[in-house]
Amino acid sequence: MPKRDDIKTILVIGSGPIVIGQAAEFDYAGTQACLSLKEEGYRVVLVNSNPATIMTDAEMADKVYIEPITLDFVSRIIRKERPDAILPTLGGQTGLNMAMELSAAGILDECNVEVLGTDLTAIKKAEDREAFRDLMNELGEPVPESDIIHNLDEAYAFVERIGYPVIVRPAYTLGGSGGGICHNEQELIETVTSGLKLSPVTQCLLEKSIAGFKEVEYEVMRDANNNAMVVCNMENIDPVGIHTGDSIVVAPSQTLSDREYQLLRDVSLKIIRALEIEGGCNVQLALDPDSYNYYVIEVNPRVSRSSALASKATGYPIAKLAAKIAVGLTLDEVRNPVTGTTFAHFEPTLDYVVAKIPRFAFDKFEQADRRLGTQMKATGEVMAIGRSWEEALLKAVRSLEIGADHLLLEEAENADEATLERKICFPEDDRLFFLAAALRRGQTIEQLHEKTKIDLFFLYKLSKTIELENRIKENPQNQEILAEAKQAGFSDAFLATCWNVDEQAIYDLRKAQNLFPVYKMVDTCAAEFESTTPYFYSTYEEENESTRSAKESVIVLGSGPIRIGQGVEFDYATVHSVWAIQQAGYEAIIINNNPETVSTDFSISDKLYFEPLTLEDVMHVIEIEQPLGVVVQFGGQTAINLADGLAKRGVKILGTSLEDTDRAENRDAFEKALEILQIPQPAGKTATSVEEAITVATDIGYPVLVRPSYVLGGRAMEIVESEEALKHYMTNAVKVNPKHPVLVDRYVSGQEVEVDAISDGVNVLIPGIMEHIERAGVHSGDSIAVYPAQRLSIQVKNTIVDYTTRLATGLNIIGMLNIQYVVDGEEVFVIEVNPRSSRTAPFLSKITEIPMANVATRVILGENLIDLGYTPGLAPEKQEIFVKVPVFSFAKLRSVDTSLGPEMKSTGEVMGKDVTLEKALYKGFVASGTTMHDYGTVLLTVADRDKEEAVELAKRFNRIGFTIMATKGTASTLEEASIPVSQVKKIGENQETLIDYIRNGQVTLVVNTLTTGKRPERDGFQIRRESVENGIPVCTSLDTAEAILRVLESRSFELESMNASEVKQPKSRV
């Protein structure tokens, strides 16, 4: 079938900000789709609210709208651009839900817009729990016994009939939001209440739990001619009961017999044909390990996280081909871009094994509930490729960057028996390490299978790894065992520990027997056809398939898995750096291990190595490629941390030298540099012990800001107001010693300002100055950033430009740097300098039209800013106003405190842009998912230090028609200022308390500032958590509340009676 010529313009809906359950995989899918449609000659209009994505670059579509993905804004874009069709299946759950909303509101009919890929009936059949169950019954496909419920009474009735445990699956939600396994009435009440709130159609499916069955996924494709094929089948190591996004996954499946494989393959193809999906689809199935019985769990009628994994695991570009199928092309007429000779209907064949391990953010959230269930909690994932499951698994473990280079975690090895049993029977994020610890202590694989229902095959493979460990320890420096260990995926670092030598000694031992990895190509066809894909993985075999080209090359280190503090912004910079290297005439090589991202799409770079970002693995690639040098500025802290080891091995680090990077990151060296440059910073010192920290804090005066040196994302950072709190921090948050000092600074409560700049060593370009709405003390990644800065005087701006220029040249920065300042009146202090790309670089690149990573890379390669066409100094400011608003995933992470402070908590960001600050903020808030009520009730409960400021806010809220509710202390302050307020009871008082009002939906906004002490038993924690669970916006900073208020004021009209001044409002009390 030829492609359709009756449509000219296609609207692609993106997935919005990164949240748990919907991450960088949709930037990858959206980028592929936009380019694929443009390649076919269509005019592409894109809407997405996330500025940190490649897909929102101007080159990706004919028209790019960085606007909220809401019915209001998408309808406006449709009316303006008049697309012939929309493609919603590449924007995750956001895209699907948006298409359903547009249809229900009549917009698609009104504007005559067709839905491509998967029609709305199919989306409804797959997403609506009742329609899906009916379709499966029609097809004769088994689904677990279930019932659709809309309230708690219906849930009780179902449980009475079939008993516990039951699984709750809300309709139309993402990453299992609001769902879970319930073993008793208390869990049922919590989960069903949450699920009904989060489901846009107030509907949940309650089903009999089949926890313990094997979970298997099939990634399938179908075209308009009803050709259908399987791209990849994957097996979850964890059985049913743990969300697939939180499971360790292997591809292809390892434990299915041919009969089982074919049975489930046929079911998957039958389902995609019945749904008449044109494009990609993910089918999840549960298989009884003791029979051929199976159940269909669910179907995602769209490109998903699993599609990204399947694409990278096989090399088959699902999203790219799904876009082509959506416009009428068929699988047998689209060439497979990997081989260039075969067509897309050939099912990929793998002659290797792929392992995926999720990456969690529990290092950031110590209070979080780490237990895994049907609601996803991972922020990202890593993938590794090997010739055996053992090799792929160990490579994936060391890709995680959790301080483990092997299946060995101190906490697991030192755990007492009770903890070990609990961690094995009730899975948490680190269960793999506890399984290894149990095997080391002599538990059998049969015992572990009984407790976990993990297939014996995987446990046997794990036990073989432990056995090999023992043989390694018993035979130091044995060459045969060394070769066997390397083939099984063991790292040099772990072998060095076993043999009590340093890592270099292991390397020398391998060099003596020429024991080095070779690189194999990922080609989709197990070498059956000729292939030239520049996509490689390492293994210890004979034949090497990667050859060095005659062209000079540059290696760019990626940023690894997505986690809080190091998100998709760094992948964005990596991709732009690669493009700049190619433009400069070099071969660009990427090393990375994140299957979700654009950088690991093999068509981006000249060569892609899918490898762990460890010194050993990176050095092997460098030895084979012999590059001109390595770029570490764009891979976040991951890449920066490798620079020292690489330089010691004689590798040229391009851009800012290692010594100068250290001068910016090492406290004492940085202080000396500031002294020479005569740039002020808040008073502070480095402490190497608890006593020293107390002395420093006493000298400079509380409050103080304490943090370990060398951190990204403000990890273990806190504002401390007393000696007692400082002792608590020093003993609980950090392991302080001379090797790992702690920084103690005077806390300046001023206005925080952030600058990204590019330096060629002589000239310094500052694309823009951003101010934060929240004052210093809230992490820059969690603050609302505004460009151009609205509250800075000309003098302050000039000072910032002067200091930035002096810092860049004084620290010999070549490439990018990010500086954070705090402004107190007209005084400017420097807080920190990061000699690398930053979280704000994509945002600033988009709005100033200066492609920062691209320009910085050209500078790193030796060009200067003036020759590249840039004038040094501050670039001319734009007329429009842009805001970057953080987005949080608190709904997924129960028991995490939502209060903002120096430790970063946001998972993503959105952008708002308009002609006034209020309009830009409105767009930003709406895009971030904040519900903006024009009237309602504000609950104020603030710390004593904030009461004076809260009075002004309350007056303004009252003026535009909001009712004010407050707890006793805050209410008294407001009453004294003659503000009408309803006093509510605190938690624990026996009458109706503020928690009841929150639960009953009587509150529309909560403003709650932190009393000192972070322990969750405090009332504030409960207020904040309840608000999140009930979908009520919470401000833990008065600055954020003031920003929301500004927006509401700009949307309201003045309503005053002519004789208003004569009448005093009575006080009311609830």
Swiss-Prot record:
Region span, Oligomerization domain: 402-546
Residues that hold Mg(2+) 3 according to the record: 820, 832
Residue numbers binding Mn(2+) 3: 820, 832
Residues that hold Mg(2+) 4 according to the record: 832, 834
Cofactor(s) demanded: Mg(2+); Mn(2+)
Residues that bind Mg(2+) 2: 298, 300
Pathway involvement of the protein, from the record: Amino-acid biosynthesis; L-arginine biosynthesis; carbamoyl phosphate from bicarbonate: step 1/1; Pyrimidine metabolism; UMP biosynthesis via de novo pathway; (S)-dihydroorotate from bicarbonate: step 1/3
GO-annotated biological processes: 'de novo' UMP biosynthetic process; glutamine metabolic process; L-arginine biosynthetic process
Job of this protein: Large subunit of the glutamine-dependent carbamoyl phosphate synthetase (CPSase). CPSase catalyzes the formation of carbamoyl phosphate from the ammonia moiety of glutamine, carbonate, and phosphate donated by ATP, constituting the first step of 2 biosynthetic pathways, one leading to arginine and/or urea and the other to pyrimidine nucleotides.
Protein name (record): Carbamoyl phosphate synthase large chain
